[in-house]
Amino acid sequence: DESLNEQMNTLNSLTGAKLTYTVKGTVSTIDHEVLKSWLVQDENGNYSIDESKEKAFIEQLADQIDTYGKSRKFTTHDGAQITLATNRYGWQVDREKSLENLKTALAEGKEQEMELSYSHKAKGTSDNDLGDVYVEISIDRQTMWCYKNGQLVVETPVVTGDISKEGRATPKNGCWPIFWKTTEYTMKGPKDANGQPEYTAFVHYWMPFNGGVGIHDLASRGNNFGGDIYKTNGSHGCINTPLEAAKTIYETVSVGTPVIVY
């Protein structure tokens, strides 16, 4: 019977793929057996793959991986366990793109190893995905640390945003990636009524991580960092850093390195 043969061919082509995804060391396989359980029939008896099953598969993998946007536990330099509410760093699976790739691979009907697509990537792959290098800033202690491969590379006093002036306190209780980095840079403040920047500052090292907030040296501070300076004479929100420390951090971090502020 021709229609039966046709149906068998359709079923075989729908269930012919064998796809493997490896997530955190665990292999998930979509094979003939799985695909048979994903089949649905319409009112005319035609078979297709149930999209909700494909979606659920990707969602389940993404839920194991995603850290971006979720609160993050962190152990501070002093060994305290804290929770960072704002988290703009981490892994985030691009669910739509990953679903598209899954559908394409199923249509191709062959055996292949699959990779998920990501809208955000972290530096590390373990549960604590900070990677080999991270920067830690304590507002209360006005201190910044930089770690590389578990070793302390820099410990320095800093001056953060001026808490006596509205809108200048450095945003804290979060984790952000370094967006970009450059040397010999002139920072410009917001424009005043005449269209001129409110301030300009030339810096040797510039590492923004949260909008206009970044780590940089500042010659005008001389050797005055740390202590209570931030309470009355702090920055516009940035992390003012002694030159040598800024240089070492600049040479240690890369774009995407996480910065933790609390």
Task: Enumerate the predicted regions with their spans.
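Exported/periplasmic cell-wall-interacting domains
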Residues: 56, 171, 189-262
